[in-house]
Amino acid sequence: MAIVSSNAEPSKGAPRPKPSRVVDAARQLDDSAELSATKEDGLRPRRLDDYIGQRELKQVLGIAIQAAMGRGEALDHVLLYGPPGLGKTTMAMVLAEELGVTCRITSAPALERPRDIVGLLVNLQPKEVLFIDEIHRLTRVAEELLYPAMEDRRLDLTVGKGSTARTRALELPPFTLVGATTRAGALSSPLRDRFGLIQRLEFYGQEDLQAIVMRAAGLLTLQLSPEACAEIARRCRGTPRIANRLLRRVRDVACVREVSGCIDVKLVDEALTLHRVDGKGLDASDRRLLELLLQSHGGGPVGLDTLAAALGEDPTTLEAVVEPYLLQLGFLQRTPRGRVVTAAGRGHLGWPADEGDAA
């Protein structure tokens, strides 16, 4: 049960939350001016049929949507987790579009005080989608407010202090909470267990990424050769968000070079090399870490704190941002003694193999 300041009188309405982004699924299809204001939104698919990849996820959610609409109920609460950039926010907007309702978008760090989340909940319309990004960062008080809201569609509030305190239970309309996180393990068990659908988003394969790049190129009115499309897909780390970002950088170079026809693989290579993205998708930070390990420490093992100090980076940044893709490629290995460059990592940077290398 949460305590709300007695300054917020019930008769004067619910306290106002911090501004949240509201996406009206029906209006979004017709309002091209609003779409062009946000480039990322302009490249997002809006229906499940347009959403490329994540086939198992689409199948599960498609069945859940049809069942909920057939019963005339709100969709069950959904938790989406996985690495950043794979389409969790996009999927929340797609769900709202399929259900024909509004999607209210906010993030956990914006919900600092009880009144922030109370204001959001009491202003929800029936069957609306409430999307909370980085939901693992919710405060304990915010989580406790969500428990009865998710389970019983009820908001339990204690208004006032001391002898004047009184308890109020506010009925909420049926709604769908969609939570997104890159750290599902950081969610408390009571919160995680209240989601009816818990789904992981996986990295995308080459074929799906090529389809995503080709679709985005069409929306940006670019002509890409199949080879150029495949090259961008190879360098985007299996992540649509990065693929779209690289495509825009290619568009910039094509614009400056005044390329009027089809963009070929040579121009793609020129553009991505300019931004120091190599053939495997490694950027300058990735290569700097590997080169430091090889040049200064013979390939490792080296502790995380030592690496961070030498690179001038925060250890958390290295562990959460730089290392995951190197581990995924098999270029880096975490051992009890520290980080080690593998034989594959040596080969990519052109270093000779060493008998002591990790396989």
From Swiss-Prot:
Per its record, what are the GO molecular function terms?
A: ATP binding; ATP hydrolysis activity; four-way junction DNA binding; four-way junction helicase activity
Which Pfam families does the entry mention? AAA_lid_4, RuvB_C, RuvB_N
- CDD domains per UniProt: AAA
Known PANTHER family for this protein? HOLLIDAY JUNCTION BRANCH MIGRATION COMPLEX SUBUNIT RUVB (PTHR42848:SF1), PTHR42848
The species this protein belongs to is Synechococcus sp. (strain CC9311)
| Subunit architecture | Homohexamer. Forms an RuvA(8)-RuvB(12)-Holliday junction (HJ) complex. HJ DNA is sandwiched between 2 RuvA tetramers; dsDNA enters through RuvA and exits via RuvB. An RuvB hexamer assembles on each DNA strand where it exits the tetramer. Each RuvB hexamer is contacted by two RuvA subunits (via domain III) on 2 adjacent RuvB subunits; this complex drives branch migration. In the full resolvosome a probable DNA-RuvA(4)-RuvB(12)-RuvC(2) complex forms which resolves the HJ.
Q: Name the enzyme group at the top EC level.
A: hydrolase
Which reaction is recorded as catalysed by this protein? ATP + H2O = ADP + phosphate + H(+)
| Cross-referenced InterPro entries | AAA+_ATPase (IPR003593), AAA_lid_4 (IPR041445), DNA_helicase_Holl-junc_RuvB (IPR004605), P-loop_NTPase (IPR027417), RuvB-like_N (IPR008824), RuvB_C (IPR008823), WH-like_DNA-bd_sf (IPR036388), WH_DNA-bd_sf (IPR036390)
Annotated region Disordered: the residues are 1-22
Which parts of this chain are annotated as the region Large ATPase domain (RuvB-L)? 13-204
Q: What is this protein called?
A: Holliday junction branch migration complex subunit RuvB
Encoded by which gene? ruvB
Domains: what does the record tell us?
A: Has 3 domains, the large (RuvB-L) and small ATPase (RuvB-S) domains and the C-terminal head (RuvB-H) domain. The head domain binds DNA, while the ATPase domains jointly bind ATP, ADP or are empty depending on the state of the subunit in the translocation cycle. During a single DNA translocation step the structure of each domain remains the same, but their relative positions change.
